[in-house]
Amino acid sequence: MRPFARAALCLLAAAGHLAQAQFPPRPEGVTVLESKFGGGARISYKEPGLCETTEGVKSYAGYVHLPPGTLKDLGVEQDYPINTFFWFFEARKDPENAPLSIWMNGGPGSSSMFGMMTENGPCFVNPDSNSTRLNPHSWNNEVNMLYLDQPVQVGLSYDTLANFTRNLVTDEITKLEPGDPIPEQNATFLVGTYASRNMDTTAKGTRNAAIALWHFAQVWFQEFPGYHPRDSRISIATESYGGRYGPAFTAFFEEQNQKIKDGTWNGSEGNRHVLHLDTLMIVNGCIDRLVQWPAYPQMAYNNTYSIEAVNASIHEGMLDALYREGGCRDKINHCRSISAVSDPENIGINAMVNDVCKDAETFCSTEVRDPYQEFSGRNYYDIGQLDPSPFPAPFYMAWLNQPHVQAALGVPLNWTQSNDVVTTAFRAIGDYPRPGWLEDLAYLLENGIKVSLVYGDRDYACNWFGGELSSLAINYTDTQNFHNAGYAGIQVNSSYIGGQVRQYGNLSFSRVYEAGHEVPSYQPETALQIFHRALFNKDIATGTIDTSSRREDGKFYGSSGPSDSFVFKNEPPPQHVHFCHILDTSTCTKEQIESVENGTAVVRSWIVVDSNSTSLFPEVVGSAEPTPMPGAALVSGRIKFHVHVIKSFDYYIFI
């Protein structure tokens, strides 16, 4: 999704017209189950009846509540509760016999509601931000889907709840203590209920997040009453920073599986459930920094769309910063060498390692990656589009904070897209450039778990050149067989080739044509076909060849074709018709943001009214007279807005 850092403000959640309306309604009708294994864990849930409206298809939204101390059995001191939000959708077809996939967006710190509501979930939100329509290419067509907000404090997940005030002009956030009066609000001073915003009460890095999620899985898969599968396979699909989440989480889960199986796991009875892991899918993932950094200068200067987003001089500067003595590559190698000695588990226990690794990421981001953003004028998640870009449309951002949605979900807090506190916690230990991600992928492949890497070929943030380099850098038994496989066209349907794929057995790398960072948003049918083929043991190219067993020559299926996908070129796309949605200011020009701040903008349903938006959404913004949106005050025929923001930051969040 968008880097909620490019604009001066990060508008995250709509506030109500009155002060009290900005707090979510008290949850009602929630079923609460205490864990049968004791220890204080609980599950709470509702059937919301939202989004998935296909007749007979159930969905459940709720929380797994883990009390303080839950993670101690795996060496993590956790003196705070972890309340992890989930939204589970049955498969539309034969859910009892369907496998299950978890979906997580990245960040770190980004809500998976973005992926659910703009990429691969059962519904999309309409431009009115108040209603939804079904997604015919939803990934729950044939797979049970479990969407998670993690780590704690992301999206609708929380540690402890608190009320805050926010000054939109000074960017000051102040906690309201119990008993404090609710202050009077105006266009730039607001209140809301959120997680604590305490950096010490969220996961510090990917490894610690894996431990928390494994405990969630132990509770949910054993005790959630709405899931009774005959097919026990569990897959994980993730995106962007999921290039780290996916390998680390899945490998950690498998390590615990093996300990449980061989009797070396000494934890409680409730934590001895083997998770039948099947497939890891990574969509436009930033996997390994050392391997993928060279892809940024290439994508900016020499891509398959013939877009020179930077000139030759800037391109050379990016390469120099990468390869010169003491540059990006050397800094990452230094980070990795000292972390291997002083923090081999990558859990942030050594301050010197944290600082060195954080410094490496800061230098590399600033000098190797960011010149594209500074000089190109093009979108970070789609090189084919100029900034600002309105795609994927952010209508879901207001919908998730509508009172009727909050009530149906049974959530006690306001939803936010991205939490900068979580991002900062990961950055504080230098999580980005640390080692181990490719080794985790090799471990999964050696243990029979499929790995499917899927990359839209217009993304810059975690681009396909870097994804391809990562796929070729996985060192496992069949590395050479994978290298020897050629690129085959991805036959999406009888008339469309959706990209190119290299595959050998359980490992595939797919380049998807005409897609930015969020592949399912751009190419929903292609993404769905790749997802199904990976999970159901079919070749990615055609979906007709079984990939689970060896051929007569003793080898697994391998794709055939050219060794290099760069030979397949594209034409630059037309520009999206621009509109500004005030809850995502990366869709807005500087002038539009200023007009919202000074009250001269006319806004309906969070959309700034102009000729473009009137043409695109006449049913929403096309009426003759300005009408206040929820949470807005009509002043002299113009609208002043009550909106939430979070602290802007000088780095990019990968959604």
Swiss-Prot record:
It is found in: Cell membrane. Extracellular serine carboxypeptidase that contributes to pathogenicity. A lipid is attached at residue 631 (GPI-anchor amidated glycine). This is Carboxypeptidase S1 homolog B. Belongs to the peptidase S10 family. Gene3D superfamilies: alpha/beta hydrolase (3.40.50.1820). InterPro entries: AB_hydrolase_fold, Peptidase_S10, Ser_caboxypep_ser_AS. GO terms for molecular function: serine-type carboxypeptidase activity. The gene is SCPB. GO terms for cellular component: fungal-type vacuole; plasma membrane; side of membrane. It catalyses: Preferential release of a C-terminal arginine or lysine residue. Keywords: Carboxypeptidase, Cell membrane, Disulfide bond, Glycoprotein, GPI-anchor, Hydrolase, Lipoprotein, Membrane, Protease, Signal, Virulence. Its EC number is 3.4.16.6. The active site is at 240, 459, 517.
